[in-house]
């Protein structure tokens, strides 16, 4: 039976995301666990177009966008030391972390 831990990291700023990824990878490598990644996932770009004036000048518009960057880390056969190391990692405020546990049979 082979277990995996998948860690998905999301952020609006790619520099903060890369720094958080390096911190997690270094913490996991200290426990001598087998890690795959970081795997860069496709970024999602949301674009919004709004009128500059409320009533007239329909052709005058302004565009805004939000870029969401994502990374994936996969840990094969994690041991309790990996879980302990992950709980002690302190990340920046702009990074969203989702941890998934997969048990293979």
From Swiss-Prot:
SMART domains: Ribosomal_S10. The keyword Metal-binding does not apply. Keywords: Ribonucleoprotein, Ribosomal protein. The keyword Metal-binding does not apply. InterPro entries: Ribosomal_uS10, Ribosomal_uS10_dom, Ribosomal_uS10_dom_sf. GO terms for cellular component: ribonucleoprotein complex; ribosome. One of its GO terms (biological process) is translation. Coiled coil: none annotated. Signal peptide: none annotated. One of its GO terms (molecular function) is tRNA binding. Transmembrane segments: none annotated. Gene3D superfamilies: Ribosomal protein S10 domain. Involved in the binding of tRNA to the ribosomes. PANTHER family: 30S RIBOSOMAL PROTEIN S10 FAMILY MEMBER. Part of the 30S ribosomal subunit. Belongs to the universal ribosomal protein uS10 family. NCBIfam families: PRK00596.1, rpsJ_bact. HAMAP family: Ribosomal_uS10. This is Small ribosomal subunit protein uS10. It comes from Rickettsia canadensis (strain McKiel). The gene is rpsJ.
